[in-house]
Amino acid sequence: MVRLFAASLSTIAVLAAPPLTAAPSPPIPMSETEQSAPALPPILSMRERAKVIDGILAERLDTVIPQIMREEGVDLWLMMSREYFEEPVVASMLDAKSMSARRRTILIFHDPGNGAPIERLTVSRYGLAGLFEPSWAPEDEPDQWQAVADIIAARDPAKIAINYSDITAFGDGMTHSQFMAMSKALSPEHRERIVSGETLSVRWLETRIASEMELYPSIVRTAHAIIAEAFSRKVITPGTTTAADVQWWYRDRLAKLGLTPWFHPSIGIQREGAQGMLDGDTVIQHGDLLWTDFGITYLRLNTDTQHLAYVLKPGETKVPAGLAAGLKNSNRVQDILAANFEVGRPGNVAMLKSRSEAIAEGLDPSIYTHPIGTHGHGAGPAIGFWDNQEYDPRGAGPINANTAWSIELTTYAEVPEWGGQRVDFRTEEDAFFDGKTVRYIDGRQTEITVIGPQ
């Protein structure tokens, strides 16, 4: 046991975390070209992160909420969360110091009409950093839901949106118990005006504002820099390091940086003569094609990246041509899919059209692209699933402008250097759709990373 522990330490370099910076550095511009071994951007201190998070949240509340409520013709939107049981929309509206709902937190947005500002009310015992107006005096009305009913009666909205949905968890935050309590407090007339807040929820969560897109490239660059470290001889010693070693290196690296993964990192190995993807305790060897799937959460935005690396054999100086061509095939499918983004087009249509075009070019694709942003697998229409390349209800919704995406897909190809073995060339890169063009947030991998001699 002791020898195994010591050996695992010797296989992976423990890299010192850079000091936390007290202020944001100049923004990194969006780029179509990905750097092969980028420097790690400065990581903000927790205090500075809170300033950024709260500033963006205030701007989103000021701009996105009026836009989506007026798009949907909803004049009152009500959401509820209970402590440690936050629904996803409410969780995204809490300031940086409000780490969960308190007791029962009820948020109300009301549009008075005629272009007047949206009212933002919190019917709870605790304020939310001045972002919502406290609107409950328990000493006057102890029943919290009756206080909500009184607010609604005073405003007499035509539509009362609450979050329930059969399709998406993002729009299904109202629990049965709380719905029953709310319904009991509301008048029969107002109960009849309840509508689903599903679309409001999706639009709030999927919409990215300019301030977020100014930050996003540095966040994706951070993920790319960490992947570049993982796919290097700093971390990987062929013949010694296992796939699981690299997975746990990622976790330790993020902990040292004060960052969070939103899923456990993946490392897979494809090897000449071996079927499928090897993982876990499999030792990485010369001649292996490595795959990683890695995502972080930072400043309330998420990344999701899949890259490939090749471990040179002794005497080799470059990636075998058949493997290099396989990645180019996946890049071509990325191009086809990006060209098929269109405002209002259902995700299903974008997937089916792209897949058909790729197959017509002689490629063997599987497309499973998803929105990203506030959540890793974000709100909005799916564009295919790895296990379903046909119509899916979750892909029926429209593609909207000002949304971020993980362009996730694969192609399969027979590699001559491996005796015609069928190899899986998985790729995933984060991108932004402005309504006209899909642009990569920090470029995309177009060449397989080379892991050479020490």
Describe the predicted segments one by one.
Residues M1-L4:
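Positively charged n-region of N-terminal signal peptides that target proteins for export
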Residues A6-A16:
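Bacterial N-terminal signal peptides
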Residues P18-A22:
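Sec/Tat signal peptide C-region and signal peptidase I cleavage site
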Residues A23-Q454:
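Active-site neighborhoods and metal-handling regions in enzymes and metal-associated proteins
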